[in-house]
Structure formats: C-alpha cells, structure tokens
C-alpha cells in the first residue's frame, strides 16, 4: 500500500482523483528519484508513461498537455493542464501548496505548484483554460492542498507587504509576540488566504473551493522543507487522474 492522501472536489461527483503521496512513500522529485516514482506510480495503478511532469522553477508558468511525449524534455514551469483523460499531470511539493483544479463542463483538469514566488499561478491556469477550452472560472472546482500554513510560516516586512498589496491584506497577520521580541520575521503568512482571494476574484464560487486545512510543517506524515531541513526534505508528488467513479 502506497502511503498517500486522496482528495475529491466539492460535490464528490466529478470524475477525478487528486492524490498526494506522503513522506513514507519516499522522495518523488522528477529526474532524481525516477526509480521510486515508478514504484509509487505502479502501486497507485498508474502507468509511468501517462505521467506528465516539469522541471519546477517556482514560477507562474502553466502548460497545456496534449500528449505525455510533449513533456519528454522536462519543460520548465509549475503548472500542467490537460483535456486528455489518459494524461496524469503531476508536480512535487514540500511546504509549497499543491492546487488541483477541474472544470465541471469543459474537459479540463490539472495541478499547480504554488509557493510564495508562484502565488498567482492560478490566474495563469484559468486564463489558459479559457483560451484553450473556453472554460469560464465559475465552472471550476479547486482544492488547496496541504502546505506550510500561517501557524508555521513567518516572513519579514517586505514579503508581508508584497502579499498584502498584491493579493489580500488578510493573507498576513502581525504576530505581536514575535514583533515585540524583535524578530526579523514578525508576520504570519497564509498562502491559503492569498489563493482563496485569487479564486474568488477570478469568479470561482466559494462553494467550489476546498481547503484541506493541513499544515505540512506541523504534520510529520508530510514532506517539509521547514521541518526536515533544506538539504534533506522529501518531495511529495501531487497528481490528478481521470477516473470512472
């Protein structure tokens, strides 16, 4: 049994499984951990040849996948959309947020890697979906997956200001105790709130937005840069596949 979490979009009837491998499944970084990736995908009942991945660069670059072969050169980017049900889009995360999305009418589904630098990638994904499939934001369902949350994510004044001005003032909160102690990271940052604001602003209904509510830095079952250390953290695979329920 491969240690993983399974998430479903709101309503539960959309034909997609959203999967996050856990720390115990082992490292899942593309190119580096190919043997383990093949083992894990096989254990999940997925042919490795169907999986589409990227060289992730903490960007807002989103690709539309037509065939797995289109990505054999490991394009640089952080989001994958597909309309072909044979394709399994996959990114890796460890404190950054996986965002799964699908449309309730258009044949469009995908997964995004959204850390602080890539916050806003959901906008690019929605724009691409509208351009390729004519998919309007109101028909999208979104899952904001496990990531480092404000309980563990403290930032400096510059990053707090950046999120407040570019996304939402509600994405940051001053920790008075840390501030009074003279910490250079006195602000608590909520990637979930920033992305929720982006989804709402784009026109995705609140009832279509699911937040798993889990913190990767708190939960030892997750890979976490903050908890495990930058040189030894576990990349988890976040993937989405078309299924027949």
Model-based region annotation:
Residues 1-245:
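Active-site microenvironment for binding and transforming phosphate-containing groups
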């Amino acid at each position: 049994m491969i240690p993983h979490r399974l998430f479903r979009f709101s309503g539960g009837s959309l034909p997609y499984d959203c999967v996050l491998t856990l720390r115990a499944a082992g490292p899942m970084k593309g190119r580096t951990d190919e043997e383990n990736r093949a083992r894990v995908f096989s254990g999940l009942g997925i042919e490795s040849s169907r999986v589409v991945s990227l060289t992730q660069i903490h960007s807002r670059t989103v690709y539309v996948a037509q065939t797995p072969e289109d990505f054999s050169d490991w394009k640089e980017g952080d989001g994958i959309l597909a309309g072909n049900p044979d394709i399994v889009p996959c990114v890796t995360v460890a404190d950054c947020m996986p965002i799964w999305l699908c449309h309730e009418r258009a044949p469009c589904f995908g997964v995004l890697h959204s850390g602080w630098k890539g916050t806003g990638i959901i906008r690019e994904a929605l724009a691409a979906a509208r351009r390729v499939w004519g998919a309007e934001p109101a028909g999208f369902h979104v899952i904001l997956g496990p990531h480092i949350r404000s309980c563990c994510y403290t930032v400096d004044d510059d990053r707090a200001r950046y999120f407040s001005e570019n996304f939402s003032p509600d994405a940051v909160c001053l920790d008075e105790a840390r501030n009074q102690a003279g910490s250079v990271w006195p602000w608590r940052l909520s990637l979930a709130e920033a992305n929720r604001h982006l989804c709402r602003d784009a026109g995705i209904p609140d009832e279509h937005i699911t937040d798993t509510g889990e913190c990767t830095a708190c939960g030892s079952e997750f890979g976490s840069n903050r908890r495990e250390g930058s040189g030894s953290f576990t990349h988890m695979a976040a993937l989405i596949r078309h299924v027949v329920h």
